[in-house]
């Protein structure tokens, strides 16, 4: 990557940052460090303490290939094949949405209800609809050892990835996957039903940032003509699968709070909480009936 005869981490970092900056990448230094660290095993401290550490020809070639993919618009965590979420290291795959930091707000909002259920009964069950990587359910399980969960998804690829993520994070004994179109194959009752469904209007999807629309699965983005179709399905059936005083939690688009609240209200649910994300946008709603 560096083009010099004696490649060092410092030289690789300078060259990688320059290439990404020229390509218009928003955080060229951050992304360059992440990709180089993946190849070399460096920590952030190592970049400061060991800048002259030698890089082999093979490592340099791998770094160059990854930097080029990033320069061409592939998201850095897609290149790495994994991403941190709520303290978990999660694998990504073709048919999984890349977990975003704002979705951690959904996890944190539901934790008190989950722990309350455990304190009352000694255990609790979670259903994560459209589980993808398993991020939401697994993060809740990590924080509550007495809980168990089911991740459902229509995608076999996503379910395989979620199962791998459960195993790599030591949560597989309390997590199972079911291939289901929403509630179609679900049975039993749950203390928490949670979902980060596709909520972007069909006509908006084509205008999304290329890093999103070209690399996240369309099925995880497109929420139908008005972006509300998944919420109608969830609200219509969730009551049949909730225990008494169970909680439904959903992630929403920044402008959907009133519409989604009205949909759930029409099915007898009361709004418990409306929470904003780190950017100050409406992002999470919880309901009970």
UniProtKB/Swiss-Prot annotation:
The record's listing under Gene3D superfamilies reads:
DNA helicase RuvA subunit, C-terminal domain, Vaccinia Virus protein VP39
Enzyme class, one word?
transferase
Q: Which domain of life is it from?
A: Bacteria
Q: Where does S-adenosyl-L-methionine bind?
A: 130-134, 153, 182, 196
Enzyme Commission no: 2.1.1.297
What would you give as a GO molecular function for this chain, any one?
A: protein-(glutamine-N5) methyltransferase activity
Q: Which positions are annotated as binding substrate? A: 196-199
Looking up InterPro entries in the UniProt record yields: DNA_methylase_N6_adenine_CS (IPR002052), HemK-like (IPR004556), N5-glutamine_MTase (IPR050320), PrmC_N (IPR040758), RF_methyltr_PrmC (IPR019874), SAM-dependent_MTases_sf (IPR029063), Small_mtfrase_dom (IPR007848)
Q: Which residues form a coiled coil?
A: none
What GO biological process terms are annotated to this protein in UniProt? methylation
Q: Which residues cross the membrane?
A: none
- Could you list this entry's UniProt keywords, alphabetically sorted: Methyltransferase, S-adenosyl-L-methionine, Transferase
Q: Which reaction does it catalyse?
A: L-glutaminyl-[peptide chain release factor] + S-adenosyl-L-methionine = N(5)-methyl-L-glutaminyl-[peptide chain release factor] + S-adenosyl-L-homocysteine + H(+)
Q: What exactly does this protein do?
A: Methylates the class 1 translation termination release factors RF1/PrfA and RF2/PrfB on the glutamine residue of the universally conserved GGQ motif.
According to its UniProt record, which protein family does this protein belong to? Answer: Belongs to the protein N5-glutamine methyltransferase family. PrmC subfamily.
Its name, as the record gives it, is Release factor glutamine methyltransferase
Query: Which organism is the protein's source?
Result: Agrobacterium fabrum (strain C58 / ATCC 33970)
List the taxonomic lineage.
Bacteria, Pseudomonadati, Pseudomonadota, Alphaproteobacteria, Hyphomicrobiales
Gene for this chain: prmC
């Amino acid at each position: 990557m560096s083009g010099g005869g004696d490649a060092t981490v410092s030289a690789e970092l300078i060259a990688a940052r320059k290439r990404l900056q020229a390509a218009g990448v928003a955080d060229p230094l951050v992304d360059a460090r992440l990709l180089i660290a993946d190849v070399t095993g460096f920590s952030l401290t190592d970049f400061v303490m060991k800048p002259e550490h030698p890089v082999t020809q093979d490592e340099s070639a791998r770094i160059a290939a990854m930097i080029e993919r990033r320069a061409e618009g592939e998201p850095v965590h897609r290149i790495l094949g994994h991403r941190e979420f709520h303290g978990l290291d999660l694998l990504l795959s073709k048919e999984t949405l890349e977990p975003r930091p704002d979705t951690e707000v959904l996890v944190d909002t539901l934790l008190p209800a989950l722990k309350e259920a455990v304190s009352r009964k000694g255990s609790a069950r979670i259903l994560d609809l459209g589980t993808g990587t398993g991020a939401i359910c697994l993060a809740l399980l990590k924080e509550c050892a007495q809980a168990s969960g089911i991740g459902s998804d229509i995608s076999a690829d996503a379910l395989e990835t979620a199962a791998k993520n459960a195993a790599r994070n030591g949560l597989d004994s309390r997590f199972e996957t079911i291939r289901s179109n929403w509630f179609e194959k679900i049975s039993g009752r749950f203390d928490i039903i949670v979902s980060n469904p596709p909520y972007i209007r069909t006509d908006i999807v084509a205008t999304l940032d290329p890093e999103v629309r070209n690399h996240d699965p369309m099925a995880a983005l497109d929420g139908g003509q008005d972006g509300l179709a998944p919420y109608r399905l969830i609200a219509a059936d969730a009551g049949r699968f909730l225990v008494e005083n169970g909680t439904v939690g959903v992630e929403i688009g920044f402008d959907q709070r009133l519409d989604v609240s009205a949909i759930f209200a029409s099915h007898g649910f009361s709004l418990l909480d409306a929470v904003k994300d780190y950017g100050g946008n409406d992002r999470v709603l919880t309901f009970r009936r």
